[in-house]
């Protein structure tokens, strides 16, 4: 009996390498699914993330979105920052009078502001960043950087220090940057994105044309928007960091493409 068991064990060890050599990847691959190569070639890999990121800049909805994203705007802006600053009032006694109008901050409204302007935008931006590192498509990443800053600067101005320079680096604990560090990084990131898209515009090419809900892939309009965003951020620093404000305001205004000056330049989701 002992010898029989030994023979069985020997046979098992002989068969094991044969099992390990089976091509399980091929067996478990869906032949009808879009491959990574096809997704990168057609823009599908990051197209949805570009659209999602654009919708987080100013979260408003459509009937197709039902109420989720509309309620997100209400809690993130209307009943939090808008009422706190006096731009918006109420005809409903929210939380029996315990709300931002009476300076009694509701945690779910406050957290909604951070989630809307930072957390949800981060996931989409991270996917585009990883794809750019894999494919080398820096035009897509430039667009994502502009959209990210459009979202994150609201979080910065609402909450103060946020994770920025080390965000997306795969760290278990991401350190927070000071406001000055974030502004400096945002200006530099905008400058890099503007340079990338200006080069693209000069070549006559488009960026994410089929997925760009704002400008339909027009890099010139995106450069104008990015320069205008740079100018806006610079004006935020007018009194606390006048030299930095002046430097980046001049950078935006003196760019060859310039800033938004006409109604046709407006950024809107159509």
Language-model region placement:
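Bimodal feature
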Residues: 2-3, 44, 199, 229
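Terminal processing/anchoring signals of secreted or surface-associated proteins
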Residues: 1, 22-23, 53, 149, ...
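Intrinsic structural disorder/low-complexity segments
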Residues: 9-12, 59, 109, 203
């Amino acid at each position: 009996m002992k010898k029989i068991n030994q023979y069985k064990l020997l046979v098992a060890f002989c068969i094991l390498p044969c099992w390990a050599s089976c091509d399980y990847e091929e067996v478990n691959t869906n032949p009808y699914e879009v491959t990574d190569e096809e997704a990168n070639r057609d823009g599908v890999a990051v197209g949805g993330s570009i659209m999602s990121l654009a919708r987080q800049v100013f979260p408003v909805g459509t009937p197709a979105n039902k109420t989720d994203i509309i309620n997100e705007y209400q809690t993130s802006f209307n009943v939090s920052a808008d009422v706190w600053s006096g731009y918006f009032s109420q005809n409903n006694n929210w939380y029996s009078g315990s709300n931002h109008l009476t300076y009694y901050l509701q945690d779910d409204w406050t957290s909604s502001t951070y989630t809307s302007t930072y957390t949800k935008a981060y996931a989409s931006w991270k996917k585009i960043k990883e794809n750019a590192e894999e494919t080398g498509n820096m035009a897509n990443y430039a667009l994502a950087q502009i959209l990210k800053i459009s979202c994150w600067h609201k979080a910065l101005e609402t909450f103060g220090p946020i994770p920025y320079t080390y965000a997306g680096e795969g760290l278990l604990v991401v350190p927070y940057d000071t406001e000055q560090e974030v502004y400096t990084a945002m200006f530099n990131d905008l400058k890099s994105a503007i340079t990338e898209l200006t080069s693209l515009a000069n070549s006559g090419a488009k960026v994410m044309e089929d997925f760009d809900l704002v400008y339909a892939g027009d890099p010139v309009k995106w450069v104008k928007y990015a320069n205008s965003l740079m100018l806006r951020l610079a004006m935020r620093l007018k009194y606390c960091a006048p030299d930095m404000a002046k430097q980046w305001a001049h950078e935006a205004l003196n760019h060859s493409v310039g800033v938004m000056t006409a109604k046709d330049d407006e950024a809107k989701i159509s």
